């Protein structure tokens, strides 16, 4: 399993939100590029970047911070937040982002996901954010009647590289991931699933691994910044 350290960008800084609330942001580093370099130097093979302002605005907002991260690091980075049209997808991939994450648009315009995945094989992931198994969109502000497993399966023939599954009620709350729901999704679809939301201890990573589900990896943010998860130990746990 791959450990994806999260760098959530708000107003040019690396922050973490509590349960997706933009008014409950903790700044962890005012230099996201330095933070990214630290993760790379510690042995991380990927970076997970989120343009939080972009997710709410529907268009890129923290482009300068993302570009600074790309200039400072050499490991691949995936990026989500405010990517809702082909021009933005092409822009980010052209700047060196390895994989774009389509969230809201995967619900509102699934044909864009299909077109992008076809045009850029291996470089388009879908971010599915859920509350009680139902998909939420637009920076988690709107809930839908769509079930996560149904939406995931609908993209199986599209060539989507990965699904990033976030349980909103666990995100940034340090309560542990929803292992059962994450494992169930990974078993229900042929698309690689990356666990996100609530990974707050080494035991959480062990639980995801012990689920036996075919998980590609796990994203962790706050726990790495707080020191609740030792990065070297986490990499070792997932590498076993």
Curated annotation (Swiss-Prot):
* Entry keywords, A to Z: Amino-acid biosynthesis, Cytoplasm, Histidine biosynthesis, Isomerase
Asked whether the UniProt record includes Amino-acid biosynthesis among its keywords, one would answer yes
Query: One Pfam family from the UniProt entry?
Result: His_biosynth
> Which sites are catalytic?
8, 129
Where does it mainly reside? cytoplasm
What InterPro entries does UniProt report for this protein, alphabetically? Answer: Aldolase_TIM, His_biosynth, HisA_bact_arch, Isoase_HisA-like, Isoase_HisA-like_bact, RibuloseP-bd_barrel
Q: Reaction catalysed?
A: 1-(5-phospho-beta-D-ribosyl)-5-[(5-phospho-beta-D-ribosylamino)methylideneamino]imidazole-4-carboxamide = 5-[(5-phospho-1-deoxy-D-ribulos-1-ylimino)methylamino]-1-(5-phospho-beta-D-ribosyl)imidazole-4-carboxamide
Supply one GO molecular-function term. 1-(5-phosphoribosyl)-5-[(5-phosphoribosylamino)methylideneamino]imidazole-4-carboxamide isomerase activity
Tell me which Gene Ontology terms the entry assigns under biological process. Answer: L-histidine biosynthetic process; L-tryptophan biosynthetic process
> Which EC number(s) does the record attach to this protein?
5.3.1.16
User: Where does the record say this protein resides?
Assistant: Cytoplasm
Query: What GO CC annotations are associated with the protein?
Result: cytoplasm
Keyword Disulfide bond in annotation: no
The domain of life is Bacteria
The pathway this protein participates in, as annotated, is:
Amino-acid biosynthesis; L-histidine biosynthesis; L-histidine from 5-phospho-alpha-D-ribose 1-diphosphate: step 4/9
Q: Which family does it belong to?
A: Belongs to the HisA/HisF family.
Question: Which PANTHER family does UniProt cross-reference here?
Answer: 1-(5-PHOSPHORIBOSYL)-5-[(5-PHOSPHORIBOSYLAMINO)METHYLIDENEAMINO] IMIDAZOLE-4-CARBOXAMIDE ISOMERASE
Q: What is this protein called?
A: 1-(5-phosphoribosyl)-5-[(5-phosphoribosylamino)methylideneamino] imidazole-4-carboxamide isomerase
| Origin species | Dinoroseobacter shibae (strain DSM 16493 / NCIMB 14021 / DFL 12)
Q: Which gene encodes it?
A: hisA
